[in-house]
Design a protein with these regions (language model features):
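Conserved nucleotide-sugar donor-binding catalytic segment
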Residues: 8, 121-123, 127, 133-135, ...
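Short aromatic/hydrophobic "clamp" motif used to bind/position activated sugar donors
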Residues: 88
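Short, well-formed alpha-helical segments that are part of the catalytic scaffolds
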Residues: 14-28, 99
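A conserved acidic beta->alpha catalytic loop
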Residues: 40-49, 68
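Glycine-rich, basic loop-to-helix element that forms the pyrophosphate-binding segment
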Residues: 66-83, 96
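C-terminal subregions of glycosyltransferases and related glycan-biosynthesis enzymes
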Residues: 1, 153-155, 187, 194, ...
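Conserved donor NDP-sugar-binding/catalytic core segment of glycosyltransferases
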Residues: 100-134
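Short loop->beta transition adjacent to catalytic acidic/histidine clusters or analogous donor-positioning motifs
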Residues: 3-6, 27-38, 46, 59-62
């Protein structure tokens, strides 16, 4: 039996509320050469029954239940290890694909551009008080390592959530780093972008649902995510290429954030980064930061965000 072109991967844990809408959006895709894999991480709600019903009607949908709860990152890696497709498409249980051609359009970018290691579409958010992050207004191919630096300059994950992305299985076989939970997505994007370029589509092909009960929201609000940021920077700033590529803006953003959040805990790292940013340049970046804050708030207010 030939392997499918793409694997749709859905890690599940107590997702009964939004799971049917998620699965319906995946089954509506016009990209047919795919498998759909769901890994239930010991749900205590009706998720398993929902999956069972869908699997009975769709032969290309396969699922299993982990013998014990593994946690978000480890369950995500179970999906990767089970996948057979050339391309991997995560769709989280709360999310949905907005367009029937979502997978087709992202896959076309990887087909056309062998040097691209990660493709993503524009972010669409569902949820009260949501504010979408717009990377840029132009579809195109962007240097992978430059995308990492740009994200660190803005202290933001410019790629977005897994539901927005598509990537090659061979470049992701390491899996998500299980030292991270709140930072797991961005760390994986960096792992992929060290291997190739980034393809960006301005179309809103998928939607990320924001609500307080989701696992990622709980982790993002925790002290642990701040600690993961520090851990990530300790790992990545040890890479010679990042030290060489670091801009003044990136260094200032990380020194400022880590110092504010961690103080003495981050002193060794922030002192090292400060040694690569001469005093006058640090002061200049600080003045730009202070001067730009009111204008940034005004711009977001005028844009309705």
């Amino acid at each position: 039996m030939n392997s499918p072109k793409a694997s749709v991967l859905i890690p599940v844990y107590n997702g009964e509320r939004h799971l049917p809408e998620c699965l319906d959006s995946v089954l509506a895709q016009d990209f047919r050469d795919l498998e759909i894999l769901l890994s239930d991480d010991g749900s205590t709600d009706g998720s398993a029954k929902i999956i069972e019903n869908y699997a009975a009607r769709n032969s290309h949908l396969r699922w299993w239940r982990n013998p014990k709860n593994l946690g978000l990152t480890a369950n995500t890696n179970v999906c990767i290890r089970a996948a057979q497709g050339e391309y991997l498409k995560f769709v989280h249980q709360d999310d949905l694909l907005l367009s029937a051609s979502a997978i087709s359009k992202l896959a076309a970018e990887l087909d056309r551009n062998p040097g691209v290691s990660l493709a993503a579409c524009r972010q669409h958010l569902t949820g009260t008080g949501s504010r979408p992050l717009v990377f840029c207004d132009r579809t195109g191919i962007y240097d992978g390592r430059r995308m990492i630096v740009a994200s660190l300059e803005r202290n933001t994950n410019l790629i977005g959530q897994p539901t927005l992305t598509l990537f090659r299985r061979r470049q992701a076989q390491r899996g998500f780093d299980e030292r991270f939970t709140g930072f797991m997505d961005f760390e994986m994007w960096c792992h992929l972008l060290e291997q190739g370029d980034f393809a960006y589509l301005t179309e809103e092909l998928a939607s990320w649902r924001v609500h307080g009960d989701q696992q990622t929201a709980r982790h993002a609000a925790s002290r642990e995510t701040d600690m993961e940021h520090l851990r990530f920077m300790e790992i990545y700033y040890a890479k010679p290429w990042l030290r060489a590529a670091a801009t003044d803006r990136m260094l200032f953003a990380q020194i400022y954030y880590l110092g504010k959040k961690h103080g003495r805990e981050a002193r060794g790292l922030t002192d090292l980064m400060r040694s690569h940013l001469k005093c006058g340049r640090f002061v200049w970046q600080w003045l730009k930061h202070k001067a730009g804050r009111p204008w940034g708030k005004l711009g977001r207010k005028l844009a309705g965000r």
